[in-house]
UniProtKB/Swiss-Prot annotation:
PANTHER family, sorted: DASH COMPLEX SUBUNIT SPC19
InterPro entries with a match to the protein in the record: DASH_Spc19
GO cellular component: cytoplasm; DASH complex; spindle microtubule
Domain of life: Eukaryota
Keywords annotated in UniProt: Cell cycle, Cell division, Centromere, Chromosome, Chromosome partition, Coiled coil, Cytoplasm, Cytoskeleton, Kinetochore, Microtubule, Mitosis, Nucleus
Protein name listed in UniProt: DASH complex subunit SPC19
Family to which this protein belongs: Belongs to the DASH complex SPC19 family.
Gene Ontology biological process terms, A to Z: attachment of spindle microtubules to kinetochore; cell division; mitotic sister chromatid biorientation; protein transport along microtubule to mitotic spindle pole body
């Protein structure tokens, strides 16, 4: 910090010496009253910089730290509250998940598993001749109904498209 401050001071002193040299050169070149007036205005606009001591810099830093510290503490407190609420939500969700898992384990077979019977070749079901005939009869009836539905859909399309202007 001290090194940077020393560099800044050296740079400022260098700038001041350059401005002085330039103003001296301009004064020596000024041959007309108009030029003298212009140079006078330029020199009046030159800003002067003062050195700032290290104790002043430290005092300013301490003032800023004292001003900012309560705000930072408030922000940290708010973040801690939010984190604790998120932790409690996480615990609640974990316990709810465990409860749901235990409920699922109590019912090993879902409704679908009970209804769906795998249709493997290994699962051969013995049926009587009557049941087989009834099944074939139901399949024929099903095919007839499919055909009837197709015919009705076709008639419906014909009636809709037949009414369209050509």
């Amino acid at each position: 910090m001290t090194n940077t401050l020393d560099d800044s001071i050296g740079s400022m002193q260098n700038c001041v010496s350059i401005v002085r040299d330039t103003s001296l050169k301009l004064r020596s070149r000024a041959q007309t009253p108009e030029e003298t007036e212009r140079i006078k205005k330029v020199l009046q606009l030159t800003r002067k910089y003062e050195e700032v001591t290290q104790s002043e810099v430290l005092a300013a830093q301490q003032r800023q730290a004292a001003e900012i510290a309560p705000q930072v503490q408030d922000l940290i407190g708010g973040v801690e509250k939010q984190i604790s609420s998120l932790h409690s939500k996480e615990r609640k969700l974990k316990s709810q998940s465990e409860l749901n898992k235990s409920r699922l384990e109590q019912f090993p077979m879902t409704r679908r598993e009970v209804v769906d019977v795998p249709r493997d070749a290994d699962n051969v079901v013995e049926v009587t001749e009557e049941e087989l005939q009834e099944l074939e009869e139901l399949q024929r009836e099903r095919e007839k109904l499919k055909m009837e539905i197709s015919r009705l859909n076709l008639e419906k399309r014909k009636s809709v498209y037949g009414k369209l202007p050509q």
